[in-house]
A protein has these predicted regions:
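N-terminal secretory/membrane targeting signals
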Residues: 1-21
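Hydrophobic alpha-helical segments and their helix-loop boundaries in membrane
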Residues: 20-243
């Protein structure tokens, strides 16, 4: 109770105009009360805390982070680039790819809600529509129908942007991860060939006690740098969403 009252006091200090407004109050017993606006603020904070997870589910972030993680493992580096750098790169590439979708959602839904020309519920429905179209265009039909079949009566649900989000979102994530594994296989192949060549050379020289991964690592790094691997992979990932 004390923590709740302390939170209300802090919010009243930060938002004096809201605190001074006449609003509906709810009695908590023992002389405590909490306003409806405070409840709205608490709900807003809760939604904001879930925003990163929502961003992962409806954007290309799962695909990008999976491919980059497979790339690092294929080279043979365990901690370099560090996880924070990999995640940051995936986030900025996500922003680059998703910027048209973000702009459309802001223009058609969020901005009118801020200008109070449409209601909150309608604005959210309009804002989520660009993400629905993005997910519907990327997901695998077989995955979608397999997920829909798990729901009672879901066989009649068609693959469309207006499909239920409870089916559209997991189908999109599974499709993105499967596509990332396919690309990861292609990325892994040249590094696997280098490992096999180095292992064969070491065996022919009788150096069976030398770990092939240790010897092949400099060659894989040199191959990746000479081929300008980061630019090639980043460009290929971005272009895969432009088609």
């Amino acid at each position: 109770m004390r923590r709740l009252l302390w939170l209300v006091a802090v919010l009243a200090t930060l938002f004096p105009s809201l605190a001074a407004a006449q609003e509906l109050s709810l009695s908590l017993g023992e002389g405590g009360s909490i306003s409806a606006r405070t409840i709205q603020l608490i709900l807003l904070i809760t939604i904001l805390s879930l925003a990163p997870g929502l961003a992962i589910m409806v954007t290309c972030f799962p695909f990008l982070i999976t491919v980059l993680a497979i790339l690092r493992q294929g080279i043979g580096l365990q901690q370099s680039p560090p996880n924070m750098l990999i995640v940051s790169l995936a986030m900025f590439l996500t922003y680059f790819i998703m910027e048209p979708v973000f702009t459309e959602a802001w223009t058609t839904g969020i901005r009118p809600m801020i200008d109070e020309t449409v209601g909150v519920e309608l604005a959210l429905q309009i804002a989520i529509q660009p993400f629905r179209s993005f997910m519907a265009a990327r997901l695998d039909p077989n995955t979608f129908h397999a997920m829909a079949a798990l729901r009672p009566g879901g066989d009649a649900i068609a693959l469309a942007p207006d499909a239920p989000l409870s089916i559209l979102m997991p189908s999109f994530m599974l499709s993105e991860i499967a596509r990332a594994f396919q690309i990861g296989f292609l990325i892994f192949l040249p590094f696997l060939i280098i490992d096999l060549v180095v292992a064969a050379v070491l065996m022919s020289m009788g150096m069976m006690m030398v770990p092939p991964a240790t010897v092949s690592l400099p060659f894989k790094l040199a191959f990746f740098v000479i081929a300008d691997g980061w630019s090639l992979i980043a460009g290929a990932l971005v272009r895969s969403y432009m088609t």
